[in-house]
Amino acid sequence: MSEILSPGEARSPGISYQELLDTDTHEVPEVLRLESPRFLGDDDISITRYTTREWHDIEVEKLWSRVWQYACREEEIPEVGDYYVYDIAKASYIVMRSAPDEIQAYPNACLHRGRRLKDYDGNCSEIRCPFHGHCWEISGELKDIPASWDFPHLEERGSDYHLPEIQVATWAGFVFINPDPDCEPFEDFLGDMADHFEGWDLANRYKQAHIAKVIDCNWKISQEAFSEAYHVNATHPNIMLQLGDTNSQVDIWDNFSRVITAGATPSPNLDYEVTEEEILRCAMDTRHDQDTPMEIPSGSTARAIAAAGG
């Protein structure tokens, strides 16, 4: 049986990610040298969190209606009048480029009868409800009410009939919204995460393609699968030659966490020795009928070749 360790002390056989970095030929950004392990407990998590309507409703109330959440990229709404429809749970929001340097967001529902104002992303010069035609400027002010003589009470309300505004913040080209008017400042929510990306200029990147897949599972099941490398041994055994699955480092901060899994190094779970050529071939997805793409100099490693850019 395995040795019994103190809470948070358990780790895999083989070297740690930090020890692996110590053997590398290239220095890494300081942020990759940070370590923030936290023991969050080992009590069982009830299946109800993944399967019940009651728990879903709790998340809608306490999470999706109160937390800062990524809605779209700025380059998806580059021109004035461009808008993006962001749906989460039963809620829908219009994220609008209302001026060259301003992004606003509104609930995607007409104030008259609640009909969705926009069904798809696009560009518009006004926001007109497709049901009765109540219309707002893209900046949210009331523009027109058909048969306004029958709605004197709305005319009197004036700015009261403005589309409700949802809080918006941007960081590195990402657009975030928060439906809670009393939410914490975005800067506090982001915390130190921006520091982790100082070496990666995400603001000047763009999304070339958007690929989505509907998965028949609770959202947490899907997200958790991409927050660990524990499944590699059973699900992706073909990449174990070049992936240090259990060498992974897991770090947890207040509002974000990260998992770092090293490539071009064999899994400690393998029960046989792997050559550097085998590691390189696996890392470069070389077929059995193909020659090794390059020669590894004597004394070098596949990981060093990868760090040098091939």
Label each residue range with its predicted role.
Residues 74-82, 90, 129, 136, ...:
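A sequence-level detector of short, solvent-exposed, charge-rich linear segments
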Residues 59-70, 141-150, 307:
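Short, basic/low-complexity N-terminal boundary segments at the transition from targeting/disordered tails
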Residues 38, 42, 54, 151, ...:
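A near-ubiquitous, low-amplitude feature marking generic local secondary-structure context
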Residues 2-120, 166-170:
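N-terminal pre-ligand scaffold of iron-sulfur
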Residues 76-181, 185-196:
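Rieske [2Fe-2S] iron-sulfur-binding domain
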